[in-house]
C-alpha cells in the first residue's frame, strides 16, 4: 500500500473550510481560518472542529483503501460515550458503514462545560477491500460528532488516484445541534446529508451544536462562499441560552441576511423556524438538562421574562420577517415552518428522546419532509 498526500489536490475535502495541521496529520474545520479570532470560547471551537458533513472525495481504481484517523470528542460527566461513524460512498451508493467508541475524549461538567478529565485513545485504522479495480468515485464521510485528524490514506501500490471535481449545485446550511446531528452515528444519515444526497447537491454544513446565534462571522462565511442555495434553521439556540430577546432577535436576523445578500442578492435562501420542543413552545429559556437527560426550563418573574422568546413567538417572527422582505422585493427568500418537519405527534411517537433532539428516525423523517419543500423552492 502507498500513502496519498492529503493536501496536494488529489483528495478533495468537501465541506471543509479550513484545517488544523500537526506533525501527525490534517484535521478539517468547518469555518475558514480567518474566523479563529472571532470564536468566543472553546465550546464553539470544538463544534467548528467537528467534521459533520465533511467528506474526502477522489477517484481511484484501487481495490483496497486504508485510512488512519485520530478522533477527539467529549462526553458530559455521567453520560456514556458517543459512537462515531465513517461511511464510504462509491459512485453515489453507500457501500460501507463503520463505527467506534474509540475517540480520545474530554470529560465536561454538564453545567459549566468545564473540562474535568481526559480519556486517551489510539488512532482508528479502517480498511476497505474488495472494492474492485474499476475506476470509481469515492467519498469517505467523516464523523458528525468528533474532531477527525486524518493521519494517513493509503491505496494499492499500482493504483491511480485523481481529484473528483463535483459539478453539482452547492448548498450551504447553517443551524443548531438539530442540523449538526451529533446523535446520528452514520454521517450520510444526518438530515442535511440525506437531503443533499437525494437532491444531487454538494453540502457544506456550518451547523454548530448549541451555537446558532446569527454570528456575523458565519454570515460573512456564507456570503463569501456564494453557494447556489442557502438555508438557515434558527431559533432554538437563542432560547436554549436565552441569548436574545425580541428587541434584538429581529434586527440580528436582518443583519445576518443583509450580510449574505451583499454578494448573493438573488440566491434562493430558505429560513427554517424551530421544530417542536415541548418545554419551550410557550415558555422562554434558558434550558438545561435534568438528571434524566431531558431538558427543562426555569420559572421567573414577569418582569424578568418580559420580551423573552418562546418557540411559538420565534416562528411568528420569522414568518413575518420573510413576508416583509418578500414584499420589499426579495422574491428568493422563503420560509419553511419547522413544525412541518417535526411536530408534536413526532414527539409523542418517541422520536424526541430528550425533548430537544430527534433520534435518527426523527432526523430521517425531517429529511423526507424538507426535501420536497426545498425542491419546490429551488
Positions of the model-derived regions?
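A general structural detector for well-ordered alpha-helical segments in enzyme core domains, enriched
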Residues: 191, 249-256, 314-321
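Catalytic His-Asp segment of secreted/periplasmic serine-dependent ester chemistry enzymes
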Residues: 277-378
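A short helix->loop->beta-strand "cap" motif at the edges of active sites that frequently abuts
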Residues: 264-269
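A short, flexible beta-alpha/helix-coil linker loop
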Residues: 178-180, 236-241, 350
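Oxyanion-hole/transition-state-stabilizing segment in secreted/luminal serine hydrolases
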Residues: 195, 214-262, 274-281, 298
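Serine-esterase "nucleophile elbow" of acetyl-processing enzymes
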Residues: 79, 130-131, 138-226
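N-terminal secretory targeting modules
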Residues: 1-170, 291, 375-378
Amino acid at each position: 500500500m502507498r500513502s496519498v498526500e492529503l493536501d496536494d489536490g488529489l483528495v478533495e475535502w468537501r465541506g471543509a473550510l479550513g484545517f488544523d495541521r500537526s506533525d501527525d496529520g490534517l484535521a478539517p474545520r468547518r469555518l475558514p481560518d480567518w474566523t479563529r479570532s472571532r470564536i468566543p470560547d472553546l465550546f464553539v471551537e470544538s463544534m467548528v472542529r467537528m467534521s459533520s458533513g465533511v467528506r474526502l472525495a477522489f477517484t481511484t481504481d484501487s481495490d483496497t483503501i486504508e485510512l488512519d484517523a485520530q478522533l477527539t470528542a467529549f462526553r458530559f460527566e455521567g453520560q456514556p460515550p458517543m459512537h462515531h461513524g465513517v461511511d464510504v460512498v462509491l459512485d453515489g451508493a453507500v457501500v460501507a458503514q463503520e463505527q467506534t467508541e474509540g475517540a480520545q475524549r474530554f470529560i465536561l461538567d454538564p453545567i459549566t462545560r468545564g473540562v474535568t478529565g481526559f480519556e486517551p485513545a489510539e488512532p482508528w485504522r479502517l480498511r476497505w477491500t474488495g472494492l474492485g479495480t474499476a475506476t470509481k468515485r469515492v467519498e469517505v464521510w467523516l464523523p458528525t460528532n468528533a474532531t477527525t485528524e486524518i493521519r494517513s490514506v493509503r491505496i494499492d501500490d499500482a493504483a491511480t488516484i485523481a481529484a473528483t471535481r463535483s459539478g453539482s449545485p452547492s448548498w450551504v446550511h447553517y443551524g443548531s445541534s438539530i442540523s449538526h446531528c451529533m446523535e446520528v452515528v452514520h454521517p450520510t444519515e444526518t438530515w442535511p446529508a440525506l437531503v443533499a444526497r437525494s437532491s444531487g447537491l454538494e453540502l457544506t454544513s456550518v451547523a454548530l451544536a448549541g451555537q446558532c446565534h446569527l454570528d456575523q462571522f458565519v454570515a460573512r462565511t456564507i456570503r463569501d462562499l456564494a453557494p447556489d442555495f442557502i438555508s438557515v434553521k434558527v431559533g432554538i439556540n437563542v432560547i436554549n441560552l436565552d441569548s436574545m430577546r425580541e428587541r434584538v432577535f429581529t434586527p440580528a436576523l436582518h443583519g445576518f441576511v443583509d450580510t449574505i445578500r451583499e454578494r448573493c442578492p438573488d440566491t434562493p435562501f430558505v429560513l427554517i423556524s424551530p421544530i417542536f420542543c415541548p418545554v419551550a413552545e410557550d415558555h422562554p429559556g434558558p434550558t438545561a438538562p435534568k438528571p434524566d437527560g431531558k431538558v427543562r426550563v426555569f420559572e421567573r418573574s414577569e418582569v424578568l421574562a418580559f420580551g423573552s422568546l418562546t418557540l411559538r413567538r420565534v416562528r411568528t417572527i420569522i414568518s413575518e420577517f420573510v413576508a416583509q422582505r418578500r414584499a420589499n422585493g426579495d422574491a428568493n427568500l422563503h420560509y419553511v415552518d419547522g413544525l412541518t418537519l417535526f411536530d408534536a405527534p413526532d414527539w409523542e411517537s418517541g422520536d424526541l428522546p430528550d425533548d430537544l433532539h430527534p433520534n435518527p428516525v426523527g432526523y430521517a423523517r425531517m429529511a423526507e419532509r424538507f426535501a420536497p419543500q426545498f425542491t419546490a423552492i429551488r
